[in-house]
Amino acid sequence: MKQTILARRYAKAVFSIGADSGKYGEYNDALQAVANLYMTNPDVVDALTNPLYPLELREKVMVGIVKSMDIDAVMSNFLNLLVEKKRAEILPEIAEEFQAMVDDAQNLSHGSVISAVELSEELQGKIQQTLEKLTGKKVELTTSVDPSIIGGIVAKVGDLVLDGSIKTQLAGLKESIKGRE
């Protein structure tokens, strides 16, 4: 079950400490690394969140992770607090919320472009510039190819979706023809 509100609160607390000390980038790297460990190793999740294991054992596991990743004292205390408060299961959500806060602080958005064919570097650059003008933020794009859109592109940045695909245009034309019958 997603606990976004709680994750956002934890992320906001750590972000404010990181922003005050100028280490939010370092904290973000640490959180992303631990969240990645969660995603790739289910045994770690079990060792940190399973209530059948004594709290002392779960804390030792987190201490081991912190030492192996050479994480600074503040972040180490935060990660240990999550284990102590039985909130370690929301660590990936906290990392996601923290990343969003870092992106916002750096005036950065992540976007995606789907096209029917592979786009040239030049065209990707033009699309990126256009999206940056529309959003007022620096945009990091990921591109993918989906032949089912027939032609054109679908660009997404945050809540903004620009669908210029032939597939969507044909669907709109079909609906307008149906409406006249």
From Swiss-Prot:
F(1)F(0) ATP synthase produces ATP from ADP in the presence of a proton or sodium gradient. F-type ATPases consist of two structural domains, F(1) containing the extramembraneous catalytic core and F(0) containing the membrane proton channel, linked together by a central stalk and a peripheral stalk. During catalysis, ATP synthesis in the catalytic domain of F(1) is coupled via a rotary mechanism of the central stalk subunits to proton translocation. This protein is part of the stalk that links CF(0) to CF(1). It either transmits conformational changes from CF(0) to CF(1) or is implicated in proton conduction. PANTHER family: ATP SYNTHASE DELTA CHAIN. NCBIfam families: ATP_synt_delta, PRK05758.2-2. It is found in: Cell inner membrane. GO terms for cellular component: plasma membrane; proton-transporting ATP synthase complex. It holds the Pfam family OSCP. The gene is atpH. It is a peripheral membrane protein. It comes from Desulfotalea psychrophila (strain LSv54 / DSM 12343). Gene3D superfamilies: N-terminal domain of the delta subunit of the F1F0-ATP synthase. Keywords: ATP synthesis, Cell inner membrane, Cell membrane, CF(1), Hydrogen ion transport, Ion transport, Membrane, Transport. One of its GO terms (molecular function) is proton-transporting ATP synthase activity, rotational mechanism. Belongs to the ATPase delta chain family. This is ATP synthase subunit delta. F-type ATPases have 2 components, F(1) - the catalytic core - and F(0) - the membrane proton channel. F(1) has five subunits: alpha(3), beta(3), gamma(1), delta(1), epsilon(1). F(0) has three main subunits: a(1), b(2) and c(10-14). The alpha and beta chains form an alternating ring which encloses part of the gamma chain. F(1) is attached to F(0) by a central stalk formed by the gamma and epsilon chains, while a peripheral stalk is formed by the delta and b chains.
